[in-house]
Amino acid sequence: LKIAVCLKRVPDTVAKIVPGPDRTSIDEAGLKFVLNPYDEFAVEEALARKEKAGAGETVAYAVGPDAFQETLRTALAMGIDRAVLIQTAGSPDGLEVARALAGELRSGGYDLILFGKLAVDDYNQQVGPMVAELLDLPCVTSVAHLEIADGAVTADREIEGGVEVVECRLPAVITCDKGLNNPRLPALKGIMAAKKKPLEVKPATLGAGSIEVLGLELPKERQAGRIVGEGPDAVPELVRLLRSEAKVL
């Protein structure tokens, strides 16, 4: 199998996010970035499939500025064979990212193209399906179990109230959900080896995109609640507060 894994660099999920000076992007000063957690499932699935087959190649792709090299090195440390950074300036929208990825993947001869189900910074769930559409490939999203046999995949995806089982032929695009596997941690040996693995940087000029961010702001602080008492004796005070302060009565 020849497998591509498409990755994104996102702020650490425990980091405190604040708007930047321009109020249209986040302030990255002192902010820690990590490999998108859902993409870890995609990396692990690629590695496990190669190990099970006993042969093949795994390639990681990312679209973004030079700082994305660190994210790709994380995938290389986990065991990915080589990586490609489609280097861009700014923050292209999902469609521009999908077009850039599709342009690179089209001639790669990949049997399987893996994405995380979503990126935790924007929750759009767009890029994987758009790449599939641009490449005219079948796509199964939010996959929690995957089987490959005889040139076809059988995928389980959790839906509200049950599990949907989908079959399609290879090549295919799969977006990976929690439960698909348990991502490995990079070992020291892998971290050292990652420094010597190929990481190709391909400068690219993307379009302006069709989405404009007008502004970012933090949610307004809410006033803390108040406990007015318990039982029937608290009802008059509660009614008074609802009428005089909350003004909902």
What are the residue ranges of the model-derived segments?
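N-terminal glycine-rich FAD/FM-binding segment characteristic of electron-transfer flavoproteins
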Residues: 1-249
